[in-house]
Regions:
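Conserved P-loop NTPase motor "coupling/switch" region that bridges the ATPase
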Residues: 101, 127-130, 148, 179, ...
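SF2 helicase motor core recognition
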Residues: 161-164, 219-221, 385-386, 422-446, ...
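Conserved Walker A/P-loop ATP-binding site and its immediately adjacent core
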Residues: 101-121
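Conserved pre-motif I regulatory segment
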Residues: 42-75
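Conserved helix/coil segment N-terminal to the catalytic DExD/H
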Residues: 138-149, 158-176
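Conserved helicase ATPase core of P-loop NTP-dependent helicases/translocases
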Residues: 386, 396-426
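A conserved SF2-helicase RecA2
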Residues: 449-458, 462-506
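Interdomain linker/hinge connecting the two RecA-like lobes of the SF2 helicase core
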Residues: 70-73, 77, 185, 191-192, ...
Length: 506
């Protein structure tokens, strides 16, 4: 069947059992998970929020959209429940005999924690069996061999090159080639990345391909090409990036580091992408409590700023009696971010030189003022996490090296209100995780360079199910790259442009 061919209209779940149509559209009450309630009122709140979870009308429309199309994107605000919509469509396709299985590619922790939990939150999805493809290669191969025994197999995006190698030898009618679901397609936006290029080689073997995203074009419309190539198998814009890029963009500099769209190109690309995408508007989303971002600006001591300016202008500086140099302006940008946070890496990540303690003192005061209210702490560098733990004790963390086995209990404890503090790295735990039941405050020791990571990270607590006023605290060192990072997030400057402007100002 073609991507636009309709198989049949989707029967709303509950209707086939005699339930009225409006019940199926407005939502289905989900049973509460078995959680030790304890005496903490936050646990009671989290349990109540889960037990009254419903399927919204826009999710039902999205499920219909997927059911009727073999190549489709769902663009919806962060926290909109895109996974539930995709699984609803899959469940109906399986029930009607059109499909047997879905292969889900998602950020590592999301694949291991969110997708297995999702099917337990909805009665009409409870029959779906989910396996997580992780661990040693032997274990992963054993699970792949048994894919026909379940409806969903989830795998982290970091394992895509390995996965493609394993799938290459399978028969065309293998269940693993029924439905491909890419959760947060921005992880595959790099046209030169190994993951996206590997997946593109076998994209056409999947009968259905669906993409889910809350940030469709995190930096520019060029970010749309590779996901569109995979989901449509090149039918939308082709499979070769460079010719498409040169038709719609021109280089801003002689080296092609930055590109700008030709007049009218952005609108043309957006309209074309809209032919294969369903978009959920913000007004379709359930009402969320207020969101407040509080910036705290710290003035670094004069000696620290003098050392900072030396690194910016000369690419070397002195700290704690040591001379530390940067090999290039781009590397110096990272060094300046470290200095703004309070340290400098010397020979490596295990060799940190003290610069100042203003930011960690700010964090300590914030934690004390919250008087036990749960706080998520976003950190950028490993040394940031070490500093946090030296100041506040052995704070648990979701980072790049966190395994699924380690992450699951931390997420459960947080959502039960049992963790007063939880640190996380936005690149490792900023996508897809549901952390809204455990708290409503977040602290950033420094802004992120990435608008997408910032938006995704905040959406871990600012999403449907959150009932409290959400406050995001951001610490900014005045006159440093912290300000450039914030401006880049707001204005979409490149790292090179931000550094150039910063040099002009100091």
């Amino acid at each position: 069947m073609s991507a636009q061919q309709v198989r049949r209209s989707l029967t709303p779940y509950g209707q086939e059992n005699g339930a009225p149509k409006d019940q199926a559209i407005q939502g289905i009450e989900s049973p509460a998970p078995q959680v030790d309630r304890g005496d903490d009122s936050r646990k009671e709140t989290a349990l109540k929020q889960v037990s009254t979870r419903t399927l919204y009308s826009y999710q039902q429309r999205a499920a219909t959209f997927f059911y009727e199309r073999d190549a489709a994107f769902l663009v919806a605000p962060l926290g909109a429940g895109k996974g539930a919509a995709a699984l609803t469509a899959l469940a109906d396709l399986v029930r009607d005999g059109h499909r047997r299985h879905a292969l889900v590619i998602a950020p590592k922790l999301v694949a291991a924690t969110v997708w297995p939990l999702e099917v337990t939150l909805w009665p009409h999805l409870a029959h779906l069996r989910v396996a997580v493809l992780n661990g040693a290669p032997e274990r992963r191969r054993a699970l792949l061999a048994r894919a026909g025994e379940r409806e969903v197999t989830a795998i982290g995006v970091d394992l895509v090159p390995w996965l493609v190698g394993e799938l290459a030898g399978l028969e065309p009618d293998h269940p693993l080639f029924d439905v491909l679901i890419i959760d947060e397609k921005s992880r595959l936006k790099d046209p030169y990345g190994k993951r996206a290029r590997a997946l593109l080689r076998i994209a056409g073997r999947f009968r259905s391909r669906w993409g889910l995203t809350g940030t469709p074009r995190p930096n520019s419309s060029m970010d749309l090409f590779m996901p569109a190539a995979v989901i449509t198998d090149g039918a939308l814009w082709g499979r070769a990036f460079v010719p498409w890029q040169r038709r719609h963009f021109r280089p801003r500099d002689p080296f092609g580091r930055e590109w700008v769209a030709f007049p009218g190109a952005e609108a043309k690309i957006t309209a074309s992408f809209g032919t294969v995408a369903m978009t959920v508007a913000d007004e379709d989303m359930p009402d969320l409590p207020p969101l407040n971002v509080v910036e705290t600006h710290l003035q670094l001591p004069d000696p620290v700023m003098a050392s900072y300016r030396a690194m910016a202008r000369k690419l070397f500086t002195t700290a704690e009696g040591r001379t530390i140099a940067a090999a290039s302006p781009l590397i110096a940008t990272g060094k300046l971010a470290q200095m703004a946070n309070g340290f400098l890496y010397g020979a490596g990540n295990d060799d940190a030189v003290f610069v100042h303690d203003l930011k960690i003192e700010w964090l300590k005061e914030l934690v004390e003022s919250l008087d036990g209210e749960p706080l998520l702490i976003a950190y950028e560098f490993i040394e940031d996490l070490r500093t946090i733990r030296r100041a506040l004790g052995q704070v648990p963390a979701l980072g790049g090296s966190t395994t699924a086995r380690e992450a699951l209990p931390l997420i459960e404890e947080w959502n039960e209100g049992a963790l007063p503090l939880l640190a996380f790295h936005p690149a490792a735990a900023g996508h897809g995780l549901n952390l809204q039941h455990g708290g409503s405050r977040m602290a950033w020791l420094s802004p992120s360079w990435s608008a997408e990571l910032t938006q995704q990270a905040i959406a871990r607590i600012y999403r449907p199910g959150q009932t409290r006023h959400v406050t995001v605290h951001v610490c900014i060192a005045t006159g440093t790259v912290d300000e450039m990072k914030r401006d880049r997030v707001l204005g979409k400057m490149s790292a090179q442009e931000a550094f150039r402007r910063h040099l002009e100002q100091i």
